[in-house]
Every structure is written in structure tokens, then in C-alpha cells.
Amino acid sequence: MARRPTPPGTPETTGVGHVVDLVRASIPPLHPAGLPFVAVPLAVAVAAGKRKWVRRAGLATAAACAGFFRHPNRVPPNRPGVVVAPADGEIALVDTASPPAELGLGDQPLPRVSIFLSVLDVHVQRTPVSGVVREVRHQSGQFRSADLPEASAVNERNSMLLETQSGQQIVVVQIAGLLARRIVCDARVGDVLTIGDTYGLIRFGSRVDTYFPVGTELLVQPGQRTIGGETVLATLS
């Protein structure tokens, strides 16, 4: 299930434990979905014997995959009502649009923020608010470049509806891209998630859309960089 973010006010260790924590902090952990992608090239490198080029290629591939599937700790803001970015990346769109039809929320346009993830960004997705998962729907589709506006409507996607304790609804949509052909979503209907929890991953370039209640004031602009689980996109009234 989702991995919890580091809560604010977590006590710090001292002595040897502090040194170990510093080393761990400098090397982001690996998302479980990336283990096969790292283990296979490592095994090839070990089995390469005297073939140096094979060993180097295996190690380089393992390192690249470890970087792609990195899963750094994040500390969400400790403020009520905030909606944080569900992913690292660059804000591609700040507009209004109808939520995915498969969620059955109607066609009324809602405030939306679209975040584009390049292959160099962290590719885990994090819960934008604390709440209960009311719906999770997968929709098959195309694999156009995720930075195109029409990608929200035509590309393969996975949509999740969250309901906060106050009854407000937030929709977050994982969208596959030109290279991304695999969407991972660990959240299930009925799960209770906390803001900043890791709930999924999209492999190799993608986009994540967040839909907000009507009237929500968005606090970000296109071109702005986001940090998943930390950057505030909006504050719910």
C-alpha cells in the first residue's frame, strides 16, 4: 500500500544513527515496482565475467533504472485544507475541464492543474489530500505525448476520486504518455489515505491531472516546477 511521508516534528537521531540517517537521506530508496528493472541488469553485470563492456552496460542500466524509480521522502505542509502536487514535474496547464467521464461526476468544468513528468522526474504519485478513496477507474486509450492538451481525453489513464473529511471531492488522474505504457495504482476503493502518501507510479514519462471543486482558487502557474507531496496547488475553502 501507500508509503507514508515523513511527518513534521519527527525526532532526529544522534551519534552513529545520525550518520546512518544522513547516508540514507542522500540515497533515495527504490520504489518496489523498480526492483525487477534494477535486479536484472545487475545480474547480467555479475554474470558478465571478463566481458567488461557487458558488465559496464549492466551497471549503467541498473543505475539509470534506480534513478528513474527513486522514491524520496517528502514532508507535506502541516496546514489544514491544502491540496499538494501529486507528482514532481512541470505544470503544463492551469485551466478548467470536465473530469473523466468514467467517474460519473457529470460534465461540469472543474478547475484543473496538469503536471507533466519528464523521464528525469520522480515518477511516483502521491495523495494530494487526506481522504477516503471513493472510486478508482482505469480507462484504456492511446499513447500520445503526455504534454499535449488532448492527452487527458484520449490517452490511457487511471482516475481516482478522493473525498475529504469535510465532504469535498478531489480527482487525481494518472495519464500514460508516449513512452509510458504501464500505470501502477495501489489505491483501492475504501482506502483511507493521508496527504503525501505514495499510491502509484507511471513508467517512463507521463502526466498527472488534478481536478478541484468549483470555485477553488489555484495558487500555481504554467511552467512552475512542482515537488510531489510538498508543493501547494490550492487551498480548499
Swiss-Prot record:
Pfam families xrefs: PS_Dcarbxylase
Enzyme class: lyase
Cofactor: pyruvate
Gene Ontology biological process: phosphatidylethanolamine biosynthetic process
Enzyme Commission (EC) number: 4.1.1.65
Example of a GO MF term: phosphatidylserine decarboxylase activity
Modified residues (Pyruvic acid (Ser)): 206
GO cellular component, one term: plasma membrane
Domain of life: Bacteria
Catalytic activity entry: a 1,2-diacyl-sn-glycero-3-phospho-L-serine + H(+) = a 1,2-diacyl-sn-glycero-3-phosphoethanolamine + CO2
Membrane topology, from the record: Peripheral membrane protein
InterPro entries noted in UniProt: PS_Dcarbxylase (IPR003817), PSD-A (IPR033175)
Free-text function comment from the UniProt entry: Catalyzes the formation of phosphatidylethanolamine (PtdEtn) from phosphatidylserine (PtdSer).
Protein's UniProt name: Phosphatidylserine decarboxylase proenzyme
